[in-house]
A protein has these predicted regions:
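Conserved Rossmann-fold NAD(P)-dependent oxidoreductase catalytic core, especially the SDR/UDP-sugar
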Residues: 82-124
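Glycine-rich NAD(P)-binding loop of the Rossmann-fold in SDR/ketoreductase-type enzymes
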Residues: 72-80, 124-128, 132, 187
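Glycine-rich "substrate-gating" loop/helix at the edge of Rossmann-like oxidoreductase active sites
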Residues: 121-126, 150-159, 179-187
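NAD(P)H-binding glycine-rich loop region in Rossmannoid oxidoreductase-like domains
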Residues: 34-83
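N-terminal Rossmann NAD(P)H-binding glycine-rich loop of SDR-like oxidoreductase domains
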Residues: 3-22
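A conserved pocket-lining segment of Rossmann-fold NAD(P)-dependent short-chain dehydrogenase/reductase
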Residues: 164-187
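Conserved beta-loop-beta element that borders a ligand/cofactor-binding pocket
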Residues: 102, 135-157
Length: 190
């Protein structure tokens, strides 16, 4: 299977690419320069012949959220997804599936356990970003199966949030970040 991936150079994307190749799939990395160009012709050419597309693009959220960085968070997700969807929709033979990342920030921190369909949408910048991001992905051609994945914090010994979280523990210090009543949604890289 030929799988196109945005964000293939990021933490999740690089591991996913290696795993897919290990299982014999061909990975087509969709690099930033394809999204920086006017129009989507080159992007559509890169997608031609792909059976699946995985959208993991987006600036890291583990930075200080200045107004300028918030704009980068939005643009790196919304504009990339918009161009990706436009390119997929232009194909005569689009991929059978598009998997597009989102985040558990959609749900906020209302406490308690919720199912994905009955959880209330949060009233926050991150929730608004997730809604807009998912809305852009939802514009993909209806012949393409759309899967939205709301990731939590990614934990792995070799990257993601875990090494940063473990740093204070090396000095014998542990603490709860934020309100201890809030849930901590996480996913293991593997």
């Amino acid at each position: 299977m030929n799988v196109a991936i945005t964000g293939s150079g990021g933490f999740i994307g690089s591991h996913l690419s290696k795993r897919l190749e290990m299982f014999g799939h061909r990975v087509t990395p969709l690099r930033r320069y394809l999204f920086a160009q006017e129009g989507v012709d080159c992007l559509a050419q890169a997608l031609a012949g792909c059976h699946a597309v995985i959208n993991l693009a987006g600036a890291p959220i583990d930075r200080r959220w200045t107004d300028a960085y918030k704009r980068e968070l939005v643009e790196s997700r919304i504009m990339t997804t918009r161009k990706l969807v436009e390119a997929v929709n232009r194909l005569h033979e689009p991929p059978g599936v598009m998997i597009s990342a989102s985040a558990v920030g959609y749900y906020g921190s209302s406490g308690g356990c919720h199912g994905e369909l009955d959880a209330p949408e949060a009233d926050s910048f991150l929730a608004e970003l997730c809604v807009a991001w998912e809305k852009e992905a939802g514009l993909v051609n209806s012949s393409v199966r759309l899967v939205l994945t709301r990731f939590g914090v990614v934990l792995s010994p070799d990257g993601g949030a875990l090494p940063e979280m473990m740093r204070p523990a090396r000095f014998g210090v542990t603490a709860t970040a934020g309100n201890p009543d809030h849930l901590f949604s996480w996913v293991a890289l593997e």
